[in-house]
């Protein structure tokens, strides 16, 4: 039995890029042959075009970029996550996985009573003596870790998922997951991610709900998530705060 405080997010693969979106602009609107369009994307041109698409609300072009992640979080967090339907999922099944033969994991915030989790697993093990995993699983708590694959395009991740799940109003665990994904997005699509970072407090009307007046809603949400679930592996937005 393993008890984790920090949910985990692994970047598996990605598709598309800001350079590809910029190249599509030349190919579709200027008649430039694709091979030439791909080679002609200067960094300043890419920044200008990504910013223009974003500011003008032409967000559908960002669906041509996306990523695949492997996420490990609690069953409670997993249930919240898969409500975002503009994504593809493949999840660990408690119906078929036998946790008496495979290590069981739990994801809980700091200070959660470990003895309760130990007792739950012992009850599960006793049930497995007479029942299949699909019945024994009913005793497992929402803290039980679930490993799942998710595929999401950049528009869904940065302009729908992030404004909802990176906010302080979201539960700390899924918020921690969201900020980990945001950090990966920053490396993949730096110009779009920076634009979204700047506008996050205004992209959803409830983003700053419950945040004390005068606090930066983003940093307040991050600090609280880290206090409950440990430090984030990457924080690329700090450079944006320093350099403006």
From Swiss-Prot:
Name what cofactor the protein needs. FAD
Q: How is the cofactor bound?
A: Binds 4 FAD per tetramer. Each FAD binding site is formed by three monomers.
Residues holding FAD: 60, 83-85, 153-155, 160
Covalent S-S links between cysteines: none
Which UniProt keywords are listed? FAD, Flavoprotein, Methyltransferase, NADP, Nucleotide biosynthesis, Transferase
Output the InterPro entries linked to this UniProt entry.
Thymidylate_synthase_ThyX, Thymidylate_synthase_ThyX_sf
A Pfam family that the UniProt record links to this protein: Thy1
Q: Where is this motif: ThyX motif?
A: 83-93
* Location of the ThyX domain: 7-199
Single GO MF descriptor = NADPH binding
Pathway field of the UniProt record reads: Pyrimidine metabolism; dTTP biosynthesis
Question: What does it catalyze?
Answer: dUMP + (6R)-5,10-methylene-5,6,7,8-tetrahydrofolate + NADPH + H(+) = dTMP + (6S)-5,6,7,8-tetrahydrofolate + NADP(+)
Q: Which GO terms describe its biological process?
A: dTMP biosynthetic process; dTTP biosynthetic process; methylation
Task: Give residues annotated as binding dUMP.
Answer: 80-83, 93-95, 137, 165
Instruction: Tell me which residues this entry annotates as catalytic.
Output: 165 (involved in ionization of n3 of dump, leading to its activation)
Q: Which PROSITE patterns match?
A: THYX (PS51331)
* Superkingdom assignment: Archaea
Query: Might you give the EC number(s) for this enzyme?
Result: 2.1.1.148
Function, in words: Catalyzes the reductive methylation of 2'-deoxyuridine-5'-monophosphate (dUMP) to 2'-deoxythymidine-5'-monophosphate (dTMP) while utilizing 5,10-methylenetetrahydrofolate (mTHF) as the methyl donor, and NADPH and FADH(2) as the reductant.
Q: Which NCBIfam families match?
A: thyX
Q: How does it associate, per the subunit comment?
A: Homotetramer.
Give the protein name, as stated in the record: Flavin-dependent thymidylate synthase
> Which gene is transcribed and translated to give this protein?
thyX
